[in-house]
C-alpha cells in the first residue's frame, strides 16, 4: 500500500484510466447548476431506484459537433427552419413563437410521436443491458431553434408518460445569429 493520498493518486493517474474506472462520466461544461443538480439527483438519490434508466435529452448544433457522450443521435434539419424568419431568428426554441412555428408543421408532430414510441420501446432494453442513463442527442444546424424546441417537447412528453429525465441545451446562445 502506497503513501499517496487519494488526490495525489488522482492527479498522477492518466485521465483515460480514471474515465475507464468511473461508473458515471458527466460533462458539466455546458450544464447549468439546475441541470447538474437534476442529473445528480436522478443518478444518486435514495429515491432513484437502480431499476430505472435516466434519459438525458441534449439539443445541439451539428456545426459544433455531435455530443461525444450521445448514445442516440437524431437529425431534425429536415424540419422547417425558423432561422429564416427574421422575427424568430434572435429567439430560441425555448421561446413560444419559435416552438409554435416548429410545431405548426405536421412532420414535427409526426416525428416526435414516432420518437417517443421508439424511446419508450428502447429504454427497457438499454436498462436490461445495465445502462443507468441514455443520452439522446437532437441536432439541427446551429442548436438554437429546432433541436431546442424538439428536445424540450420530448422531455415533457416523456415526463407525462412517467419517464423522468433531464434536458440540456448544449449550444443555445453559441453563435446564435450565424449559420
Q: Which residues are covered by each model-predicted region?
A:
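C-terminal accessory "lid"/substrate-recognition subdomains
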Residues: 2-134, 159-161, 171-179
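Catalytic cysteine-centered active loop of the rhodanese-like fold, especially the PTP/DSP P-loop
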Residues: 133-155
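Post-Walker A helix-loop "phosphate-sensing" segment adjacent to the P-loop in P-loop NTPases
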Residues: 155-165
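A structural preference for short, hydrophobic beta-strand core positions in alpha/beta folds
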Residues: 167-169
